[in-house]
A protein has these predicted regions:
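A short beta-loop-alpha structural element at the N-terminal edge
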Residues: 1-12
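Conserved beta-strand in the GNAT
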Residues: 51, 57-66, 83
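A conserved beta-turn-beta hairpin within the catalytic core of GNAT-like acetyltransferases
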Residues: 68-79, 89, 136-137
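Conserved acetyl-CoA-binding loop-helix of GNAT-fold acetyltransferases
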Residues: 84, 90-103, 130
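Conserved active-site alpha-helix within GNAT-family acetyltransferase domains
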Residues: 95, 107, 119-137, 143
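Conserved GNAT acetyl-CoA-binding A-motif
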Residues: 105-116
């Protein structure tokens, strides 16, 4: 497991295609994905993208975006874009990647890690619960400012 680089962006887009095919709110758009991935990779204050490689092939990824919580008065992480290719699931790769991401966040002074999953993705809910996450009472709301 290591940090993604700019040269990984095409393969990261392929992983995001897999993820977005499962998520109701998102559709793949490589131009926008490349822009966002580049911004994260190029600025460690924004976040980090962690990847799992098999030889030169990316088989999993997760990103951690950093912000400050006024409730905690400290840095926190938002875990996003967590995906492992289907043919590599159920063999511990996701668990290792998540554990690595949590440790990375802790070492980078994150006092809390938050993530979102689709409401009906029970497999993901069980996975995160097995790994120490719990359902928050907070409910996300979105406003797409380009649509207003």
């Amino acid at each position: 497991i290591d940090k993604a680089t700019l040269t990984d962006i095409p393969q990261l887009c392929t992983l995001l295609d897999e993820l977005f095919s499962q998520e109701a709110e998102f559709t793949p758009n490589h131009t926008l994905q490349e822009k966002g991935l580049s911004k994260i990779i190029s600025n460690e204050n924004v976040g980090v993208i962690l990847v799992v490689r098999e030889s030169q092939k990316l088989i999993g990824m997760v990103n951690i975006l950093f912000t400050i919580s006024t409730a905690l008065g400290e840095r926190v992480g938002n875990l996003e874009d967590f995906v492992v290719l289907p043919e590599y699931r159920n063999c511990g790769i996701g668990t290792k990647l998540l554990s690595y991401a949590v440790t990375f966040a802790e070492k980078n002074d994150c006092q809390r890690i938050t993530l979102l999953t689709d409401d009906d993705n029970e497999d993901a809910h069980r996975f995160y619960a097995r790994n120490g996450f719990y359902r928050s009472s907070m409910v996300p709301f979105r406003l797409n400012t380009l649509d207003t």
